[in-house]
UniProtKB/Swiss-Prot annotation:
One GO term (biological process): protein ubiquitination
Domain COS: start-end pairs: 434-492
Name of the featured protein: Tripartite motif-containing protein 42
The encoding gene: TRIM42
Gene3D superfamilies the UniProt entry points to: 4.10.830.40, Classic Zinc Finger, Immunoglobulins
Zn finger limits (B box-type): 235-280, 285-326
Coiled coil: 382-407
Residue spans, zinc finger RING-type: 146-192
InterPro entries: COS_domain, E3_ubiq-ligase_TRIM/RNF, FN3_dom, FN3_sf, Ig-like_fold, TRIM42_RING-HC, Znf_B-box, Znf_RING
Domain Fibronectin type-III: 603-701
């Protein structure tokens, strides 16, 4: 068999073998020596007649494999997929099944197609299954789908109301929008809010990069092939040479993409040794371009407005606002998102117990009701002559009470189950977001995710304690005593449990001080009352003239997770079983909250060191706060000393106590040295558990600073230990 020729791809130009009048690229299969192995890029948009698929197993992975009737097998072609997919996928030909080809003087004149066959997937040449559908039981995919078309899209755009829609749905909304002289009015299909957008064919909305990354990751893990048609992930070309070769590195200092030859030619000089180089990434470069100023890059984050800023945005629209760098903003928002997830995890266990308890209680109603009915019937047979009317009343009361109680429990179980399922999807979405290393993509949605989780916590209600009481307890009948004094001791019967109506009670506001502080500032301050034990004067720097031990710390104080002042304060309200006529504001029986504390004071639980910033002679360490009460933190740090032969020892450098923040900055460290940190929390009951050790290596002074992000991994280990 001859070697296959790759048509219209980087390895071969199609002009060498195809007529220039060829209007359909699928025709070029006839000009290849092996039609089953020909690949070329897809020239059509999504959902057109011609179907292509990206082949990762080909010689040129940037090419696309065409499933076409010009191949040796006109019915279907096997498409190679990624290693994460277990099955091969087949596509029925759609572009050339019913093709009419016209030649004129030996040259191709025209091609007409009339195929409308749908895309199918299967596992063999003869077996063809239905189109792959989105799993209905996935909570995460509900947050990845476009809310308007309910489809997975790689690119979605954020409306000012923070809801994301795909580009097709936005174009559809724009087509039917009300148009004025300078703008058109878009109505969000989720919240029905109106937004005035500039009248332009260009998309004026910011792209939701985090949503796109998570959707692409979900497609890769679950075997969806649509992510392979993403045209935004093409090769990055060199910005210096005229040959437009593929870029090898990106110079952060020059802000240029360079191929290998240009990199050696222009950056081999001694004056450019300080330039910083990174791998080329189309996603990173697109994300950091300001949507309002395309020539400027995003460099800072505004705390006041929760916006990403370039240099022009900062001085034009956010002058005087509290702005921080992107890496510091990622630290803040990651801590806030972790706090919101931890809040929900802290009460999820109790919610599950409540749901299980009511399911068991609901199933036991029938058996308990039959037993009670028999007891009542036998008792009233002895007293029928004088208690016939009373018997009727008691039976009606029990039946009505049982029906009313079941309705209340069914209503609580249904509403709470739906809310928990919704929150599970949101939590899964947030965990996937914490895996993201892109700063802009993460910061676009971090604050939104925190607000959504906290709103979900406020609207999840705890059941009314009256629902836990069995209905038979309201009819305490003792027929021996009733026989002797029936007229005096006959009970009046239980009071009817009042319905709460269809409206949900208004919850109390969430106490955000129960977990990690929302805001972490990065200005350094010194503490004069801390106990610091150091190995030598070269380890820590002290600037005070009275020579008191001081270390640069973060300025933001942490709000302690103190016990609420009222027993009704917490994170969740009760599900009410009050009367229909009773207003929500006047009912005090259901304004009770789930609590993080179980009533008994404990020593602090383990904490997690979630980020470190390392400089040649300084280091910043950030850690989380346990759910228990905390008075202060204590840190120990060691220097790792290696002596021959292969003998590694850790020498204590310092012990810092009475730390009132959740971060610490150390100065005058030795460059190119490995240090080990560990932190624990302390309260009135004593010190808690030490955190897992965190190893850092200070740079030698010539390289760039290092930032260690292990947030998601540390969060998962901490949650497994705590819950």
């Amino acid at each position: 068999m001859e070697t296959a020729m790759c048509v219209c791809c980087p390895c071969c130009t199609w002009q060498r073998c195809c007529p220039q009048l060829c209007s359909c690229l699928c025709c070029k299969f006839i000009f290849t020596s092996e039609r089953n192995c020909t690949c070329f890029p897809c020239p059509y948009k999504d959902e057109r007649n011609c179907q292509f698929c990206h082949c990762t197993c080909s010689e040129s992975p940037n090419c696309h494999w065409c499933c076409c009737s010009w191949a040796n097998d006109p019915n279907c072609k096997c498409c190679c997929t990624a290693s994460s997919n277990l099955n091969c996928y087949y596509y029925e030909s759609r572009c050339c099944r019913n093709t009419i080809i016209t030649f004129h003087k030996g040259r191709l004149r025209s091609i007409h197609t009339s195929s409308k066959t749908a895309l199918r997937t299967g596992s063999s040449d003869t077996q063809v299954d239905e189109v792959k559908s989105i799993p209905a039981n996935s909570h995460l995919v509900n947050h990845l789908n476009c809310p308007m078309c309910s489809r997975l899209r790689l690119h979605s755009f954020m409306l000012p109301c923070n809801h994301s829609l795909c580009e097709k749905c936005l174009r559809q909304l724009q087509k039917h929008a009300e148009v004025t002289e300078n703008f058109f009015i878009l109505i969000c299909p989720v919240c029905d809010r109106s937004h005035c957008m500039p009248y332009s064919n260009k998309m004026q909305l910011p792209e939701n990069y985090l949503h796109g990354r998570l959707t692409k990751r979900y497609m890769q893990e679950h075997g969806y092939l649509k992510w392979r048609f993403d045209r935004s992930s093409g090769p990055i070309l060199c910005q210096v040479c005229r040959n437009k070769r593929i870029a090898y590195k990106r110079c952060i200092t020059c802000r240029l993409n360079l191929c290998n030859d240009c990199l050696k030619a222009f950056h081999s000089d001694v004056a450019m040794q300080d330039h910083v180089f990174v791998d080329t990434s189309a996603e990173e470069q697109d994300e950091k371009i300001c949507i309002h100023h395309p020539s400027s890059r995003i460099i800072e984050y505004c705390r006041n407005d929760n916006k990403l800023l370039c240099t022009f945005c900062k001085f034009s629209f956010h002058n005087g606002h509290d702005t921080i760098s992107l890496i510091d903003a990622c630290s803040e928002r990651a801590a806030s998102l972790f706090s919101a997830i931890a809040k929900f995890k802290a009460v999820r266990y109790e919610i599950d117990n409540d749901l299980m308890e009511f399911n068991i209680l609901k199933n036991s109603f029938k058996a308990d009701k039959e037993a009670k009915r028999k007891e009542i019937r036998n008792g009233f047979l002895k007293l029928r002559s004088i208690l016939q009317e009373k018997e009727k009343i008691i039976m009606e009361q029990i039946e009505n009470l049982e029906v009313s109680r079941q309705k209340e429990i069914e209503k609580y179980v249904y509403v709470t189950t739906m809310k928990v399922n919704e929150m599970d999807g949101l939590i899964a979405y947030s965990k996937e977001a914490l895996k993201e290393t892109g700063q802009v993509a993460f910061l676009q949605s971090a604050k939104i995710l925190v607000d959504q989780i906290e709103d979900g916590i406020q609207t999840t209600y705890r059941p009314d304690p009256q629902l836990r009481l069995h209905s038979i307890n309201y009819v305490p009948l003792d027929f021996v005593e009733l026989s002797s004094a029936i007229h005096e001791l006959f009970p009046t019967g239980p009071k009817k449990v009042r319905s709460s109506g269809d409206s949900l009670p208004s919850p109390y506001p969430v106490h955000s001080e129960t977990m990690i502080a929302r805001k972490v500032t990065f200005s350094t301050h010194s503490l004069g009352n801390q106990h610091i034990y150091q190995r030598s004067s070269s380890m820590l720097s002290f600037s005070n003239t009275d020579k008191k031990a001081k270390v640069g710390l973060e300025a933001c104080g942490r709000a302690q997770s103190a016990t609420p002042a009222k027993p009704t304060d917490g994170l969740y309200t009760y599900w009410s079983a009050g009367a229909d006529s009773q207003s929500v504001q006047n009912s005090s029986s259901f304004h009770n909250w789930y609590s993080f504390n179980d009533g008994s004071v404990k020593t602090p639980g383990p904490i997690v060191i979630y980020q470190t910033l390392v400089y040649p002679r300084a280091a910043k360490v950030y850690w989380t706060c346990p759910a228990e009460d905390v008075d202060s933190f204590e840190m120990e740090f060691y220097e790792v000393i290696t002596s021959p032969p292969n003998n590694v020892q850790m020498e204590l450098c310092g012990q810092i106590r009475d730390i009132m923040q959740q971060n610490l900055e150390l100065h005058n460290l030795t460059p190119n040295t490995e240090y080990v940190f560990k932190v624990r929390a302390i309260n009135d009951n004593g010190p808690g558990q030490w955190s897992d050790i965190c190893k850092v290596v200070t740079p030698d002074g010539h390289g760039k600073n290092r930032a260690k992000w292990g947030l998601l991994k540390n969060i998962q280990s901490a949650l497994q230990k705590h819950f």
